[in-house]
């Protein structure tokens, strides 16, 4: 089954490619909602909005990922200084990654917990030099030099990357 991925995320495209899913990419400019005390609602509504923005196409897959810690939503950082601040705040702590995934109007939410290593300023500088942190929620990518900052995680690795695979299997996509 061929689908439309309503996302410009290279990590989401990589996951679909690894699963052997045939897809086209459509980038959308849907406005993003933010409910700091309700991360599940945030990702659910954003995933649905991105899918709706790709209409009138059918078989549209869309997703939204956030990092949630201390009652705060960490989306994509504005710039490198913002990214470094995110990493400092998450250093040595456990945070939660939420991804809302929508397919043809149905939406599912995945949750994973991630513990960061204690990061020195040098660790943070090395990480941001290796990874472009400004295009990813929470300023990090577990799949790209994640070993520098991630100590452990529970839940779906693919969810932390931005596209949990369990809903894709439920919908018969993968």
Q: Positions of the model-derived regions?
A:
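N-terminal beta1-alpha1 ligand-phosphate binding loop
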Residues: 1-21
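Flexible, glycine-rich phosphate/dinucleotide-binding loops
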Residues: 12, 32-34, 169
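Anionic-ligand binding patches
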Residues: 1-4, 36-174
